[in-house]
């Protein structure tokens, strides 16, 4: 089938924002204006098309990123909706991996918020070109210019206004387009009746000032334009737009525009901005991967290249079962064909291919290079896996996901629910790589772990709603870790003689504290331990490290150097060396000044001035470490690092301290040593 839209007419982009900045409403409006939605869905009523899981509709937040295709002025737009709540940053990370550009939505009265920073850092990591849309210009306290300043200060980004608002708060009527130097005024509620005219007289000076700053910023990114600009020549609209597009794609400029999605003002201009300034698949570097020989290989975005695609999300649909959201990077993915899942080394049959529109589906015969869609019928594919042709295997860059920081015990209310719960949990773990589930060896309880309390609340909610499993839930537990403070040497000998063949393994190790992942170095010389037994020592140590000596938590940040040992011709075996390895590890840890580590959260608390002292006192009582304070719109913002164990139930405490006016956001930051007194308390509880 011939391609309907050439590659340069594609825009794969995401919409990212802090919770409540109006991201879902903005996406809704894009779907409305691009003709895919006849009635606008409102998030307040729980009727929005992008938020299609029942929990999202109740809570009014977006949890699952859905990829939606729509069309605008001869362009195909694929919108990847990303959640703005910090517990779901993995979804954001995952969407950023497959999109080419992004629109960051800011709330006009709050500017840059904590989650905006998190998402911005993730977008920096993947080098995603972006533009900023300052939403809610009609809200009380809206301040466009303050927003631009917060972007420059807190995100260290070169934000350049290409529009300025005409009126704000309830007087917001439209905007001045600084490129064309014209006013755009909205005359009706649906944003269909637009009047373009002269810049209002009272705004002329401000428009002139911001237009001059914009032209200078654009000229600075292009030598030819800079020369013309310095010689005092007028730069044409076309020259400015071409240079601005290039500068945005190169991450040199972040264009800033404004609007009110809820009031239908400025959304069409934002879609025009996506087309004008965000990259097509041809504007970004070709995707890299490794072939089976471990050599780097590049795949160009072209239908003629060998097929390669990345499954970036697995979801369970009540009607068709398992959907694998996929982006095709090169070649053509055809329904009914066989492909190789190169990450797992398994063949897969492509059942049906569908393009998603929020919650409805359109079946297609094929997905071409740069297209996004969902594959039905894949058995072994999970998030982050590569699909490719067998003739030209490639593994695209693997996605990395953070480890969970909080866990709870969960049990079904009825015996019959046990098996149902097991199946449901494994399905949910397949969809979400930051959600883990296992059985506690000591208590036999089922444990679920995730990125925060809301994350686990939603998992329990889905168990009840989608899988009809009623559960009892235990109190949240912190994912402590253990580590060592000094390098030590230790040895262990495992020798057993009980009639017939004995067991013999003996090893000497050095255990060294590090900052990174576990490392095992084989420093045996002269065959003190035969080569075939070395992996057994490593495995013994890995297993022993799952349960440290303080309170049985996993041990991290250490390196093992195996430097000596001995063996017996007859009695030595892999099992004996595995046991010797785990004994040596325990002996080493006992001498190495072991400490308990706890997850420390980066917390940002927003409170009215009068509650400041009270809230800071409370932060200190929670072992918090103050990082700084700002004021924004008459509210104080307190930034601190607080141990996760002290944050349970904080929402309620903050509400009662501030009469419901305080809010907070937190995200995992790092692990740190637990004070001695608390270490003893944790160990005492665990070892009871």
From Swiss-Prot:
Annotated transmembrane regions: none
Gene Ontology annotations for the cellular component aspect, listed alphabetically: cytoplasm
GO biological process, one term: ribosome disassembly
Keywords annotated in UniProt: Cytoplasm, Elongation factor, GTP-binding, Nucleotide-binding, Protein biosynthesis
GO molecular function: GTP binding; GTPase activity; translation elongation factor activity
The family this protein is said to belong to: Belongs to the TRAFAC class translation factor GTPase superfamily. Classic translation factor GTPase family. EF-G/EF-2 subfamily.
Function of the protein: Catalyzes the GTP-dependent ribosomal translocation step during translation elongation. During this step, the ribosome changes from the pre-translocational (PRE) to the post-translocational (POST) state as the newly formed A-site-bound peptidyl-tRNA and P-site-bound deacylated tRNA move to the P and E sites, respectively. Catalyzes the coordinated movement of the two tRNA molecules, the mRNA and conformational changes in the ribosome.
UniProt xrefs under PANTHER family: RIBOSOME-RELEASING FACTOR 2, MITOCHONDRIAL, TRANSLATION ELONGATION FACTOR G-RELATED
Record-given protein name: Elongation factor G
Originating organism: Clostridium perfringens (strain 13 / Type A)
Lineage of the organism: Bacteria, Bacillati, Bacillota, Clostridia, Eubacteriales
Gene that this polypeptide is encoded by: fusA
